[in-house]
A protein has these predicted regions:
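Secretory-pathway/luminal and periplasmic proteins that interact with or process carbohydrate-rich
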Residues: 240-249, 265, 300, 324-336
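Cell-wall glycan-active module
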Residues: 2-8, 12, 20-237, 302, ...
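Short, functionally critical alpha-helical segments immediately adjacent to catalytic or ligand/cofactor-binding
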Residues: 226-250, 257-259, 293-294, 318-323, ...
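Short pre-active-site segment immediately N-terminal to the catalytic Zn-binding motif
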Residues: 226, 278-281
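Active-site/pore-lining binding-face segments in mid-to-C-terminal subdomains
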Residues: 307-330
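Substrate-binding/active-site groove segments that recognize
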Residues: 249-276, 288-301, 346-349, 374
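Non-membrane alpha-helical structural segments and their capping/turn regions in soluble enzymes
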Residues: 212, 287-291, 312, 316, ...
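Active-site metal-coordination segments of metallo-dependent hydrolases
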Residues: 206-209, 280-290, 365-366
């Protein structure tokens, strides 16, 4: 009896010795499966994200081309909003307003029968237009959103602030006194029509007024995300000339020209804790856009390019990366897009040598010019 019990006990011990590693292996296997599932889910989310933006981008380019073609029925040279111009047409496309932020001017074109009174009426409407209203009247974006609906799950908020809030009622007399009026022919289907065109200069102080208008938001987000206020203003100046309705061909949106697919993705991850596409309406809101720009600069400074030791050298690299991406900055220093390898080269150079190397070897002329403009404007805005 005792012997039988001993044999039974030994068998039980043997079973337990075998079971422990089997359980451990089972747990490891389950963990690996969990990790694999997580990775697959992440990759699927990445793929869905890229696909959603690609669908939006394709629709945007198609709607842009279609709208431009429509406008040719009434305009010899159709003009559509871009980074430095905010353009609106009347519902019947017979009248047009163009706010040129680089030239600091407003041009209003109306049918001749509307007369100067019609021109002044359009000017008054324009000066009262809010960002919400401007967004609703943005034909290309509205048509694209109706087809695709980019970022529908993102918070939506343009703004009830006037687009041209930096222009005061007391500026109007001076602006109109310097107006240039001309009459010209424009197409009307197969025929032609007469158009009155009025161009008025905006106040010389307009850019500095706009900076002051956004100063509190810029300062708050610069402090929160540990980036230089002057750099943020310089980027805003270079990206949009302080045009809150700025939109590029990519498209990027708003004051600091955030592309939903690239900078916008990183910003959403940081701000909302998940990868999501930020909508045009969200990015046309100045508060949202300024925050997004500050967050992206923080990511460039303290994540992507953090291995660059000298603050001035890192600033030059960040400026270039804001325009072209960190990988393309690396290409100016090494054969490839390895940022860590590029940082090792950069850390052996003076800031001036880094700046000159970027100007000589960045892949694109646009980025070289961008670096020159933003660096010089940053210096100027430090004394603003």
């Amino acid at each position: 009896m005792a012997r039988y019990g001993l044999i039974g006990l030994g068998f039980g011990v043997a079973v337990s010795l075998v079971t422990v590693p089997m359980l451990a292996w089972s747990e490891v296997s389950a963990f690996e499966r969990f990790q694999q599932q997580r990775q697959q889910a992440f990759e699927q989310h990445q793929s869905d994200f890229q696909e959603a933006f690609q669908e939006f981008q394709d629709a945007f380019h198609e709607e842009f081309a279609a709208y431009q073609e429509e406008l040719r029925a009434n305009w010899r040279e159709p003009r559509i909003s871009d980074r430095h111009r905010w353009v609106e047409y009347s519902d019947d496309q017979s009248s047009r307003t163009v706010v040129d932020y680089e030239e600091n001017s407003i041009t209003i074109d109306v049918p001749s029968e509307a007369g100067t009174q019609g021109v002044l009426s359009h000017l008054n409407d324009l000066l009262g237009r809010t960002m919400d209203e401007a967004y609703d009247r943005d034909e290309v974006t509205q048509r694209t959103q109706q087809r695709v609906g980019l970022g529908e799950d993102a918070p939506e908020a343009a703004s009830d602030q006037r687009v041209l809030s930096e222009i005061k009622p007391e500026d109007l007399d001076e602006m109109i006194s310097q107006a240039e009026l001309e009459e010209r022919e424009e197409p009307k289907g197969e025929e032609s029509r007469s158009v009155i065109s009025l161009t008025v200069p905006m106040p010389e102080q307009r850019p500095s007024r706009k900076v002051e208008e956004f100063r509190e938001q810029i300062r708050r987000h610069a402090e929160r995300y540990e980036v230089e206020e002057a750099l943020m203003i310089a980027i805003m100046h270079s990206e949009s000339s302080f045009n809150p309705m700025a939109r590029s061909h990519i498209p990027a949106f708003g004051l600091m020209q955030i592309v939903p697919q690239t900078a916008g993705k990183d910003v959403a991850q940081r701000v909302y804790g998940e990868m999501k596409l930020l909508s045009p309406e969200y990015l046309y809101n100045p508060e949202n856009n300024i925050q997004a720009g500050a967050v992206y600069l923080n990511i460039l400074f303290y994540s992507y390019l953090s291995a660059i030791e000298d603050p001035e050298s890192r600033m030059y690299a960040v400026i270039a990366a804001y325009n072209t991406g960190a990988g393309n900055v690396a290409r100016a220093f090494v054969d490839g897009r390895n940022i860590r390898a590029a940082a090792r080269v950069i850390n052996d150079l003076t800031p001036h040598e880094v700046y000159e190397r970027l100007l000589a070897d960045l892949p694109y002329d646009e980025t070289r010019n961008y670096l020159v403009h933003v660096a010089s404007r940053t210096e100027a805005y430090r004394n603003f």
